[in-house]
Amino acid sequence: MGAKKVLILGAGLVARPMVRYLLERGFEVIVASRTVSRAEALIDGHPAGRAVAFQVEQIEALDPLLAEVDLAVSLLPAHRHVEVARRCLALQRHLVTTSYVSPAMGDLGDQAAAAGLLFLNECGLDPGIDHMSAMQDIDRVKADGGRIAGFTSWCGGLPAAEANDNPWHYKFSWAPRGVLVAATNPAAWLEDG
């Protein structure tokens, strides 16, 4: 069996670490972006990588790319994930995204599970990594017989003091539109419970 193939959709700010990680571990990687030069920069001449042009507005162009891979990772803006998920479902491909699960993505996730596919969402720093690391800590404390009296998690693009040079006091590591949309999402927390 050959190397697993992964399609990365988008060559924005969060793509570089993922592309590098996958290539260093022997995966074949296709980076699809509207700006091929950015995808090429991410591949950086690696023999197991390939950069291709992809315009998300032409979603049918995704099908031949999906036909080549085992897994798609959508790093596109969150409002594009549903279109990608529909294509992955039609072509029986697993999907990973970094965004919250919208009702439409939830419905497609149920269909994917019924088809034996994994649609894994919320795998970004906001919200995924902080959730996973929190659960790891909580599980460890409970396994050692401890009890959680309180837990607070602060996560995001908080810059070092010397780099805190803008009115937002924030450093964009992902699409600014996505940051603004996420900032308007409702929040919930559990306190004293």
Regions found by a protein language model. Give the residues of each.
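Rossmann-like dinucleotide-binding core of oxidoreductases
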Residues: 117-193
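N-terminal Rossmann-fold NAD(P) dinucleotide-binding loop
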Residues: 15-16
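N-terminal Rossmann-fold cofactor-binding loop
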Residues: 32-36, 55-56
